[in-house]
Amino acid sequence: LNQFDKKWRTSINRAAEAMTIFAVICAAMWPLIHMGRPWLGYWPLPLPNTFGSLWPNFHSPLLWDVFAISTYFSVSLVFWYVGLVPDFASVRDRAPNQLLRMIYGILSLGWRGGSMHWHRYETAYLMLAGLSTPLVLSVHTIISFDFAVANLPGWHATIFPPYFVAGAVYSGFAMVINLAVPIRHFYGMKDFITDKHLDNMAKIMLATGLMVFYGYGVEAFMAYYSANEFERDLMMKNRVFGPYGYFYFALIFCNGLMPQVLWFQRVRSNEAALFVISLVVNVGMWLERFVILMSLQRDFMPSAWGQYSPTFWDVSTYLGTFGLFLSLLFLFCRVLPMISIAEMKHLLPESHVHSHKDSHDHSDSAHGGSH
């Protein structure tokens, strides 16, 4: 949205970026857990060691995940932090005590709001936005390679990279709506996060939802058209009509059919309906991953067939990520500006009276002592 100069992003970008970082933190836990020995989690990193020429296996998708998650987290964190610098300065100047003033002063990096500060800030922010855009595509493509490079029916498919990228944008906007609706309702921010913002996000969700739905159709069609009996049996006898078939139909309903009501303006302008639809979409995206994995519970040998039922530890570990995500989210709402103060000032009518440079100089003189 920043690259396309969409001004309406201002009210939602801060919460969306925070959500991304917190979600990546939760996601980074799972490769460690799946290793079985998390205390050896540093082994996939290319670190100097005493074993001579021992290096990670760069052919392993697990190592690709390490680089994808760490790169995504690093760039997202820097992008989020750079956007916060002017707001840290605003909070610093209004801090109620010396300790908070010192903490926010360190975080604001000596920001004074001069024209040179603004010039360097906007240049850095634009460069990071440009870097983040292809990074989103590459990261989710690499995640899809975890499945696509495996020579297994149902996984070895070229549709997976665009399918995962569209799904990431789809579920991302659904999650932003799930956060924006309670925030605007309980924090009294309906003047900042307006019905127009929800309407625009719903339209993007509808467009990406159609892409994901198309991916489901291509996946089913290619399983039939390829004349590969293993692909066909996996799709028809396992996913659709197998023991987990009801999850597949629930997935089609949640991700494909339910969002079609977003074609109607009345639905897009109803925040309660949008919240429910977004929640259903997020459930559907979880079911998508579940169906991808659980469809392999019937191997090539019938002796290896079995039914999966989650244990207490499976459920509690998964619910723990919800707790971690919500804890970080509430801390964010408590100690940081949920909406970009600096960018909101640019949208005020009086900010367009002068030129861009003059508006910064006017802001500096109005706040006295900013140089």
Where do the protein language model's features map onto the residues?
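Transmembrane alpha-helical segments in integral membrane proteins
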Residues: 1-4, 72-90, 175-185, 256-272, ...
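C-terminal TM-helix exit segments that contain a strictly Trp-centered aromatic cap at the helix terminus
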Residues: 28-39, 215-222, 285-295
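Long, contiguous internal "core" modules enriched in hydrophobic/ aromatic residues
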Residues: 49-251, 354-362, 367-370
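TerminUS-proximal long segments
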Residues: 252-259, 265-371
